[in-house]
Amino acid sequence: MNKDEAGGNWKQFKGKVKEQWGKLTDDDMTIIEGKRDQLVGKIQERYGYQKDQAEKEVVDWETRNEYRW
């Protein structure tokens, strides 16, 4: 599986992403569609985080959920 593409796993984890980052809209989720870089970017945009802070949140989320892109 490509590092930036979650493929089928994305459908399983979409709800967990929305739980973690409730400010993400359904349109955001469509844009993200399993692409890690898009998730980091949308977290930056919606929460006003710097890239490193958004990246850290995603890494923490991946670890907690045993999610691999």
Swiss-Prot record:
Gene3D superfamilies, per database record: YjbJ
Chain coiled-coil ranges: none
Entry-linked InterPro entries: CsbD (IPR008462), UPF0337_stress_rsp (IPR050423), YjbJ (IPR026042), YjbJ_sf (IPR036629)
GO cellular component, one term: cell pole
Domain of life from the UniProt record: Bacteria
Family designation: Belongs to the UPF0337 (CsbD) family.
Protein name: UPF0337 protein YjbJ
Organism for this UniProt entry: Escherichia coli (strain K12)
